[in-house]
A protein has these predicted regions:
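Core beta-strand elements of the Rossmann-like FAD/NAD(P) dinucleotide-binding domain
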Residues: 14-16, 247-257
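Short hydrophobic core segments
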Residues: 20-21, 253-263
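Glycine-rich FAD pyrophosphate-binding loop
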Residues: 35-55
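Dinucleotide-binding Rossmann-like beta1-alpha1 core, especially the glycine-rich loop
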Residues: 59-178
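A conserved short coil-to-beta-strand element within the FAD-binding core of flavoproteins
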Residues: 225-239
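Flavin (primarily FAD) binding-site architecture
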Residues: 260-275
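Central beta-strand plus flanking loop segment that forms part of the substrate or channel wall
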Residues: 277-295
C-alpha cells in the first residue's frame, strides 16, 4: 500500500489491536509474528525502517561462541540454530563467514575456563590445591586445547538435522608453518591457528525492509508506516497521538496493546506514553571500521 493511502486509512480507522513503536529488528519480528497470527497490527517508526541500532551493528550473525565459557549452553544452542535458519531462509543477505583464531600456546586458560564454566571462578585452584598463578597476559589467552574443545562443543548444534541446507563447514586447525604460509602477516609467536565459521549479514537494513514488505503482502491486517513519531497520550490515556514527520499531520490511535520496541530510546518513549521508566544504563558499544584490503 502507498504511504498516503496508509495515512488516509489511519485517519479513518483509529482502533487497532496492537501498536508497535519502533521498526528495528525486534519491532519487525513482533510485527511479523502477530501478522502471521492474523492479529491486526500497526508498526510505526520516527525514521526509516531499521535505521537505528539494528543498522549500526557489526553485521555478524554469530552463534554466541563466547558464551560457552559461562556455561550458557541453551543460549548458544538457540543462537546457532537461529543463525542456521537465517542462512537457509535469507541466503541472498546472510553468508558464511570464516573466522581465524591465532593460538599462541596449547595449555593457557584450561583451569580458568573450566572453573568459569562450572561456576567456580572464585576458587581457581589446581588439582594440587594450590591457587593458580597466571603469567602475564595469560588471563586473556585461550590455549589450543580450550579452543579445540570449545569449537567441538560449538558445532554440536550445527547438525544437518537442524537446518540441512545451511550446515556450516567444520572448523580446522593449522600448525605454525601452514598458518604463516597462508597468513604471513601473523605474529611468528603463534603455534597454530583455528578457523571456524559463523555468518555475516551484508545489509541488515535490506533484510529488515524485506521482512516488512513481505509481511504486509501476506496479511491485510498488517500496516507499517515510517516517519511517524509518538507525541504522547490524549486525555483519555487510551489514545496514542502520532505525528507525521513529513506532512505535520497528527493521528489518534486507540490500541488494545502497545509494544515499545524503540531500543535505547525506550525510556524516552515510555515517558511520552505517561509511563516513566529508567531501564537504559550508561553502556555503549563501539565498532571500528578499517579500510584494509588484506582483511
Amino acid at each position: 500500500m502507498i504511504r498516503q493511502d496508509q495515512l488516509r486509512y489511519l485517519s479513518q480507522q483509529s482502533k487497532v489491536s496492537v501498536l508497535i513503536i519502533g521498526a528495528g529488528i525486534n519491532g519487525i519480528a513482533a510485527f511479523r509474528d502477530l501478522a502471521l497470527q492474523n492479529v491486526d497490527v500497526l508498526m510505526v517508526d520516527k525514521g526509516d525502517f531499521c535505521s537505528g541500532t539494528s543498522s549500526a551493528s557489526s553485521h555478524m550473525i554469530h552463534g554466541g561462541i563466547r558464551y560457552l565459557e559461562n556455561g550458557e549452553l541453551r543460549l548458544v544452542r538457540e543462537a546457532v540454530q537461529e543463525r542456521n535458519r537465517l542462512l537457509q531462509l535469507a541466503p541472498h543477505y546472510v553468508k558464511p563467514l570464516p573466522t581465524m583464531i591465532p593460538i599462541f600456546n596449547w595449555q593457557s586458560g584450561i583451569w580458568k575456563i573450566a572453573a568459569k564454566f562450572f561456576g567456580l571462578s572464585g576458587l581457581l585452584l589446581s588439582p594440587t590445591g594450590l591457587r593458580l598463578a597466571q603469567s602475564k597476559g595469560e588471563g586473556h589467552q585461550r590455549g589450543g586445547v580450550i579452543v579445540k574443545l570449545g569449537l567441538m562443543l560449538y558445532e554440536l548444534w550445527n547438525s544437518p538435522s537442524i537446518v540441512t541446507a545451511a550446515r556450516m563447514p567444520s572448523h580446522r586447525f593449522q600448525l605454525k608453518v601452514s598458518s604463516l604460509k597462508q597468513f604471513p602477516e601473523l605474529s611468528s609467536d603463534i603455534v597454530a591457528t583455528a578457523i571456524y565459521y559463523d555468518a555475516v549479514v551484508l545489509s541488515p537494513e535490506r533484510l529488515a525492509v524485506e521482512l516488512v514488505t513481505e509481511t504486509e503482502k501476506m496479511s491485510q491486517n498488517a500496516t507499517a508506516i515510517n516517519y511517524l513519531s509518538v507525541v504522547g497520550m490524549a486525555d483519555s490515556q487510551r489514545t496514542v497521538i502520532l505525528h507525521d514527520e513529513v506532512s505535520g499531520q497528527q493521528f489518534q490511535i486507540q490500541p488494545e496493546l502497545v509494544i515499545n520496541a524503540t531500543g535505547p530510546w525506550i525510556d524516552l518513549t515510555n515517558r511520552k506514553l505517561g509511563q516513566p521508566t529508567d531501564f537504559i544504563g550508561g553502556s555503549k558499544g563501539s565498532h571500528l571500521v578499517l579500510d584494509h584490503p588484506k582483511l
